[in-house]
């Protein structure tokens, strides 16, 4: 039984390999290509591509920069009331961005993957015998879960070690200043009997345990008057509150991977087109698309509290990916055939992977993490505003599917 089932997979895999290595099939696509041929104008298309590169670059850079600059100004500002209001505004903006990412995965990426892998240029078997887009998206979502877990565990352990070392050094320095309970004689830590190193270790353990207990008691308190006592939680639990930034680092990096992988395909598809009729509506649609995605990514990067150079690097790579794809597409347009089976399979697989990554990130790391948090449940006004922002973001991005 097992040998017969395993042997049935072999022809299936051979069919996939044979279909990818097949020749181009422009004749099959003739029904949809006539309009493009009538509107074909390489000079006008090249001018529009240059406009698209500039517009998409500016839109993407602006989208990713707004949350980064806003978060930095909020962090640098000294006002207490302004910080609270801008904090609520940031939560609303993040909810809007989560809706954008969710719609990108479901409405744009899955649809594009289905369109590529059901193209008439690909043989019916195996590409229409099995739902490859959904299957690859599922595998990508599961792989993202594993990477999310492993990455978060790694960053949190590293952060705890750094925190414990810093607490031990501070406590030991304080005791030395007070002339307290450390042996002065042979205290260089060479022998393991009550030297400075052992004292620092013991002090560090006690300091960390006390801070952990103190922070736990205040951060997880009940709602007071419909909202969490943020000032109290922040004042006494600051050391413990820094922990989530490790998770935000992983979230921002995985989200960038999902966005960048499909941005390359989008840019390449626009770059190889020689039809102004196709390119013209895409310029505005992709500019809005890039702005919304940049806004979502910028919010995650700012929450990760990365160093300025790391944040700039992530924002820079996001902003240039689609314009770079357009440039490469324009350069290879004379000999690249987007209807070749190999190009269609690569596009469909990458779009499916991007869909799985973005759907997982939107539902698990953006929507569930914020909408099920105590801060949200203790603030009904913030709850209502966040749901409205979430639906607005999803609807705005879904509407772009009419043009993009």
From Swiss-Prot:
Cytoplasmic side: 71-86, 151-248, 302-311, 365-383
InterPro entries (UniProt xref): ZIP, Zn/Fe_permease_fun/pln
Extracellular side: 23-49, 108-129, 270-280, 333-343
Biological process (GO), any one: zinc ion transmembrane transport
CC annotations in GO: plasma membrane
Top-rank taxon: Eukaryota
Leader sequence segment: 1-22
Keywords of this entry: Cell membrane, Ion transport, Membrane, Signal, Transmembrane, Transmembrane helix, Transport, Zinc, Zinc transport
Residue ranges that the Swiss-Prot or TrEMBL entry lists as coiled coil: none
Any one GO MF annotation of this record: zinc ion transmembrane transporter activity
Pfam families recorded: Zip (PF02535)
Subcellular location(s) per record: Cell membrane
Segments crossing the lipid bilayer: 50-70, 87-107, 130-150, 249-269, 281-301, 312-332, 344-364, 384-404
Membrane topology: Multi-pass membrane protein
Protein role: Zinc transporter that may be involved in zinc uptake from the rhizosphere.
Family under the similarity heading: Belongs to the ZIP transporter (TC 2.A.5) family.
PANTHER family: ZINC TRANSPORTER 10, ZINC/IRON TRANSPORTER
Protein name: Zinc transporter 10
Organism whose genome encodes this protein: Oryza sativa subsp. japonica
């Amino acid at each position: 039984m097992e040998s017969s089932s395993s042997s049935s997979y072999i022809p299936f895999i051979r069919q996939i390999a044979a279909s990818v290595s097949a020749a181009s099939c422009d004749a099959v696509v003739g029904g949809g290509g006539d309009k493009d041929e009538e509107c074909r104008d390489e000079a006008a298309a090249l001018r529009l591509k240059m406009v698209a590169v500039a517009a998409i670059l500016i839109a993407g850079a602006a989208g990713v920069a707004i949350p980064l600059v806003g978060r930095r100004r909020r962090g640098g500002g000294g006002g207490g009331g302004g910080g609270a209001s801008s904090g609520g505004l940031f939560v609303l903006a993040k909810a809007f961005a989560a809706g954008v990412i969710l719609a990108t995965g479901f409405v744009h990426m899955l649809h594009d993957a289905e369109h590529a892998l059901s193209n008439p240029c690909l043989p019916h078997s195996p590409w229409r015998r099995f739902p490859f887009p959904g299957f690859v998206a599922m595998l990508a979502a599961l792989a993202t879960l594993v990477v999310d877990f492993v990455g978060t565990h790694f960053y949190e352990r590293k952060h705890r070690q750094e925190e414990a070392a810093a607490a031990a050094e501070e406590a030991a320095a304080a005791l030395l200043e007070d002339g307290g309970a450390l042996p002065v004689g042979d205290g260089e830590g060479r022998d393991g009997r009550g030297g400075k190193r052992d004292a620092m270790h013991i002090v560090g353990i006690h300091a960390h345990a006390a801070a952990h207990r103190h922070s736990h008691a205040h951060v997880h308190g009940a709602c007071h008057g419909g909202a969490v006592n943020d000032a109290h939680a922040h004042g006494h639990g600051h050391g413990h509150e820094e922990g989530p930034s490790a998770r935000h680092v992983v979230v921002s990096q995985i989200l960038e991977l999902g966005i960048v992988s499909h941005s390359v395909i989008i840019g390449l598809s626009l770059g190889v087109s020689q039809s102004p009729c196709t390119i013209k509506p895409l310029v505005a649609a992709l500019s809005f698309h890039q702005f919304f995605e940049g806004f979502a990514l910028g919010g995650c990067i700012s929450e990760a509290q990365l160093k300025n150079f790391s944040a700039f690097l992530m924002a820079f790579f996001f902003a240039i990916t689609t314009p770079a794809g357009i440039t490469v597409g324009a350069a290879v347009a004379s000999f690249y055939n987007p209807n070749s089976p190999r190009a269609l399979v690569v596009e469909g697989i990458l779009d499916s992977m991007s869909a799985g990554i973005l759907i997982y990130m939107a539902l698990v790391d953006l929507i569930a993490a914020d909408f099920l948090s105590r801060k949200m449940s203790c603030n009904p006004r913030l709850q209502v505003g966040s749901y409205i922002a979430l639906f607005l973001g999803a609807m705005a991005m879904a509407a772009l599917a009419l043009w993009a």
